[in-house]
């Protein structure tokens, strides 16, 4: 199965049910008054973490998620049925962002964690809510509020305890297949691994951890070259890094040069990655020149003052299994004390860190535009369009209420400033109205 780690989808919450206009008609109840009920709430779209999922494959074939609308209100003040929320399961480790603004909405880390990504519209109010001493029998009601619509970007970063990094053909897939139940593709050519493979490693002392074989890295990856960012985003979440370096030299490559290039790419992408526990793993020690190359490599590491830390070096041969058990034990020891990556620690309920909030005063953003070829004004804006959709245009009373709401928002003044005259056509959301300015 391919590892799909990015997807873009659309979510559409359910519209609220419409409120209705109704009056109480009962024997012996004089002037019963308004009795129209409210609409039910529309269903929301909720993401929920399911630790059993491993990829975003499902979102490749289903990119549109829609919740049901709420039921309309009834007579006798009865409220319409609220729609069920639609729960969409996502893998553990999914980052959810708004595709239009780039805002990160949440990092879905904990099994069972939920996030409302599109809120269902509230039900419209029935005429029972609009009675006043001046108007005891109102013919006013609201349509349901539109459900929220969002374009979302999903990005899955591997949640593994240990990440295997290194140049292509360094032996990452072979090591994973030896120490775990994973069956990655292994072949004698570069970039055999194009997507992460994950395996569970279990030691003789019952310690276990999750290991990920990440796609091979090349120079320039921090600028997106090769598999670039697709590789590096997964490294961010690993607690311990095993840096595999090919000691065979069969392709004329210098092990230490390759090692430094990988470090440079990690540092350019995110320098904090280099502060994590790391083991350098010289591989293919069963090859003829490997011992000589290892001795030279150790000397170069020891004399390099530019290294962030002097790493542990554990040579292995995945073919003969030499050194593999020692490597896994040392890895488990490091994991026991390794902290979670700082940027991905889930916030705890007892978090007492100071938070700041910004007050945003209410604004009425809308635009007025003259469409010359149609000889009409175009009035647009999210708030205006929402108010219009919640207006029952079949009833004069609700249209008059909508006109008052627009006047309160400053629409009349804005139209007059733009040059609108009495009798001009004004279009709102594909419906036309006649402009009449009121002082």
Swiss-Prot record:
Root EC class = hydrolase
Query: Which residues lie in Basic and acidic residues bias regions?
Result: 344-354
Membrane-spanning ranges: none
Q: Where is the segment annotated Disordered?
A: 338-357
GO molecular function (one): magnesium ion binding
List, in alphabetical order, the GO biological process terms annotated in this UniProt record: ribosome biogenesis
Question: Highest taxon of the source?
Answer: Bacteria
Keywords recorded for this protein, A-Z: Cytoplasm, GTP-binding, Hydrolase, Magnesium, Metal-binding, Nucleotide-binding
Q: Name one Pfam family in it.
A: DUF1967
Q: Which InterPro entries match?
A: G_OBG, GTP-bd, GTP-bd_Obg/CgtA, GTP-bd_prot_GTP1/OBG_C_sf, GTP1-OBG_CS, GTP1_OBG_dom, GTP1_OBG_dom_sf, OBG_GTPase
Write out the GO cellular component annotations.
cytoplasm
What name has this protein been given in UniProt?
Answer: GTPase Obg
- Its gene is obg
């Amino acid at each position: 199965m391919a590892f799909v780690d990015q997807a873009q989808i659309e979510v559409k919450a359910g519209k609220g049910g419409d409120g209705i206009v109704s009056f109480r008609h009962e024997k012996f109840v004089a002037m019963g008054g308004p009795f129209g009920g409210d609409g039910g709430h529309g269903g929301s779209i909720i993401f929920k973490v399911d630790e059993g999922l491993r990829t975003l494959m499902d979102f490749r074939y289903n990119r549109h998620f829609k919740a049901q609308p709420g039921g309309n209100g009834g007579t006798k003040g009865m409220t319409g049925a609220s729609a069920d929320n639609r729960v969409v399961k996502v893998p553990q480790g999914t980052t959810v962002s708004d595709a239009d603004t780039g805002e990160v909405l949440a990092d879905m880390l904990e099994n069972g964690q939920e996030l409302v990504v599109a809120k269902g519209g509230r039900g419209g109010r029935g005429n029972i809510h609009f009675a006043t001493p001046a108007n005891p029998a109102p013919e006013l009601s609201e349509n349901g509020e539109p459900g929220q619509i969002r374009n979302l970007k999903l990005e899955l970063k591997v949640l593994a305890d240990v990440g295997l990094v290194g140049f292509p053909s360094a032996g990452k897939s072979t090591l994973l297949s030896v120490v775990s139940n994973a069956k990655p593709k292994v072949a004698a050519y570069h970039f055999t691994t194009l997507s992460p493979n994950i395996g569970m490693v279990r030691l003789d002392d019952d310690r276990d951890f999750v290991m990920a074989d990440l796609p091979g890295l090349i120079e320039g990856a921090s600028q997106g070259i090769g598999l670039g960012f697709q590789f590096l985003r997964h490294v961010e979440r690993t607690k311990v890094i095993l840096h595999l370096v090919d000691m065979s030299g069969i392709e004329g490559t210098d092990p230490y040069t390759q090692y430094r290039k990988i470090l440079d790419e990690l540092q350019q992408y995110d320098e904090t990655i280099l502060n994590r526990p790391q083991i350098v793993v010289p591989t293919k020690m069963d090859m003829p020149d490997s011992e000589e190359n290892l001795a030279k490599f150790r000397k170069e590491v020891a004399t390099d003052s530019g290294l962030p830390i002097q790493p542990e070096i554990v040579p292995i041969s995945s073919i003969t299994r030499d050194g593999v058990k020692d490597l896994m034990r040392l890895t488990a020891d490091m994991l026991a004390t390794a902290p979670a990556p700082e940027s991905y620690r889930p916030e705890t309920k007892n978090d007492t860190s100071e938070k700041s909030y910004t007050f945003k005063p209410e604004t009425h953003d809308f635009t007025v535009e003259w469409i010359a070829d149609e000889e009409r004004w175009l009035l647009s804006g999210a708030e205006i369009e929402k108010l219009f959709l919640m207006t029952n245009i079949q009833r004069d009373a609700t249209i008059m209420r909508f006109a008052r709401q627009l006047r309160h928002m400053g629409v009349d003044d804005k139209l007059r400033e733009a040059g609108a005259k009495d009798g001009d056509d004004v279009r709102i959301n594909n419906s036309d109205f006649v402009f009449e300015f009121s002082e």
